Amino acid sequence: YTTLFRSTSLFAQKGNKTKAPVSKSEFIEDLLSKMTLDEKIGQLNLPTSGDITTGQANSSNVAKNIEEGKVGGLFNIKTVSKIREVQKIAVEKSRLKIPLLFGMDVIHGYETTFPIPLGLSSTWNMPLIERSAQIAAKEASADGINWTFSPMVDISRDPRWGRVSEGSGEDAYLGSQIAKAMVKGYQGNDLSLNNTILACVKHFALYGAPEAGRDYNTVDMSRIRMYNEYFPPYKAAVDAGVGSVMASFNEIDGIPATGNKWLMTDVLRKQWKFNGFVVTDYTGIPEMTDHGMGDLQTVSALALNAGIEL
């Protein structure tokens, strides 16, 4: 619902010659009423750009799926010319002309490269950190990118974990302040401006606390420790108005975060009042089969019912 509005609202006047619905709800309901079930499912798909990066967009398999309404967005596609070429397929050749979202890992800069997140956090300089995200947003948006998979705010206290350098370290307060600064830097005060991009706080939740420091491993933690030591940076990003949240790979209470309704609905939606959209990490849904949660159809339903939207 939210994803459809974010991607279509920018193109509503150009793509629809009739008078656009007055409110967001009316706009979305009108669009949904015209969509087939396959097109609705298609909006859930966020594939990598695949052969578009090496071949002509119009002749690629991904392009064919876009034309058939089976793709909601793409990630890891770069350059204005390539993004424009692919977007034209969506808004000119697909039945409903719903534009695509374009996401990329804009982590510590885009064209201008800043220190890694752990290095930035060591400055304790929030205006500087916010400014780095703002510069990255300006450069990425100029290239046609709408959405970054950042900030990563996972608290980590085990140096064996291989992704420590991507976060802000072990301190929940510092991590929370950086989360707010990064969200503000990326999104600014108005996401409709063409020099801002949608932020995505990740990886929700507890991804930096796997047993033995092994990536993707399970997490066994009390609720008191979760809320006091690991949740604060995610909550700070939500309070700052982050537009999207990425689910983590790890299990929490024996259930992968991607299919964990307590985490994605009870905590994120009901307790924290988050009103953006939730995306899986790369292959997050099929990897639940390795956790023994069922076949692909079963884990897909588990994720959707838990609150996953893309």
Positions of predicted regions on the chain:
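Short, small-residue-biased leader/transition segments that mark boundaries at the very start
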Residues: 1-4
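Glycoside hydrolase catalytic-domain context in secreted enzymes
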Residues: 9-310
